[in-house]
């Protein structure tokens, strides 16, 4: 796996009663269904992939690639999550980090709940991770 949400999804698919090959197939299928988003900040001024980035700006990463720059972490998280959702999505998990508040995470959840109106289950977890305000998993 390449991301934390993919690793978590693969771990949840593990079944000790299955063979190595069956587990490999199930775990691979599980992590292949996961799209990952990350909301972080620019540590310094830079240029990246055609984007002019200023220190402190909020960066939205779509499966590891810079998607857009924002100034508000809640807006960035909602916008990025919406871009990760596809027709078959069923679950959204938002892990909020050490530099995001539970209130901000619940604002994200509220906006996504309103947008998807129960069609997609939205969960918020205090991940406590450094560097990333939010890590987003869409399955």
Predicted regions span which residues?
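N-terminal loops that bind phosphate or other acidic moieties
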Residues: 1-139
